[in-house]
Structure formats: C-alpha cells, structure tokens
Regions:
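Short, conserved active-site entrance elements at the starts or edges of catalytic domains
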Residues: 1-21, 57, 63-64
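Conserved catalytic-core subdomain
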Residues: 20, 25-129
Length: 129
C-alpha cells in the first residue's frame, strides 16, 4: 500500500521481526564495504534462481558475498542496492524513499558478467514443433 501511494515501481517487504526479506517479485541485495549481502532463506524469502546465480557469480568474480540478516538501517546505509529476478535479471535500485543510490562498480560488474554466466551455465533446449 505504501509503495502504491508513493508511486514506487517496487516494494520492499519486511518480515514480522522487521527484517528485509525481498521485493514483491524480486530478491534484494545490498553492497556494503564492497561485500554483497542478501537475506537468508529463513527470514521468509523465495530462493530465486537469479539470486542463486548472483551468489555463484560473486564466487567466480572473487566478490565477497554472504546471506545475512538485513535491517532497514543496513538497507538505507548501503553503498549499492540491486534486485534480481528471472525477468528482471539484475536491476540497480536508484532510490528508496528519498535516499539516492548510485550504480556502483560491484553492481555494474555483475550486470556485465550476467550474460556470459547464463550462456556458460545454461542447457540448450530444443523442441520439435
């Protein structure tokens, strides 16, 4: 409701403890001190395929990453924020409420590597029509 009232393109969901979980249709990541962080499954998220791909990409690119509790303060003080989803792929977040975020080097690196990662890790499927 708050996101609709603010004409936001996406809403960030909190669990009953006030921790960041995910967005309405995407997983969420923050970058803090160069480390990529995303909420763990036990806070109440759907473990998306693209989310898992980003965690694997971080390993391949030697980017530190972890699944960790993220609270609102962590989110609003992050250097970078991005969301992931099958259709969205990797999308940088530019603004939350009145706080602006830049598309940082880490997010940009992941966006640029994503097509190569998908090509390398996908299985071709052919359907005879």
């Amino acid at each position: 409701i708050e996101a609709n009232n603010a004409n936001a393109q996406e809403a960030i969901m909190l669990n009953q403890n006030g921790y960041i979980t995910e967005c309405t249709a995407d997983n969420i990541f923050i970058v803090h001190n160069g480390k990529v962080k995303t909420p763990p499954a036990y806070v109440g998220i759907l473990e998306g395929i693209t989310r898992e791909s980003v965690l694997q990409m971080c390993k391949e690119l030697n980017i530190e990453s972890e699944e960790v509790i993220i609270d609102v303060k962590d989110l609003l003080t992050a250097e970078e924020v991005f969301i992931t989803g099958t259709g969205a792929e990797i999308v940088p977040i530019r603004q939350i409420n009145n706080i602006q975020f830049n598309i940082g080097k880490t997010t940009q690196k992941l966006i640029e590597y994503f097509p190569e990662f998908v090509k390398k890790n996908s299985t071709p499927v052919f359907v005879k029509v």
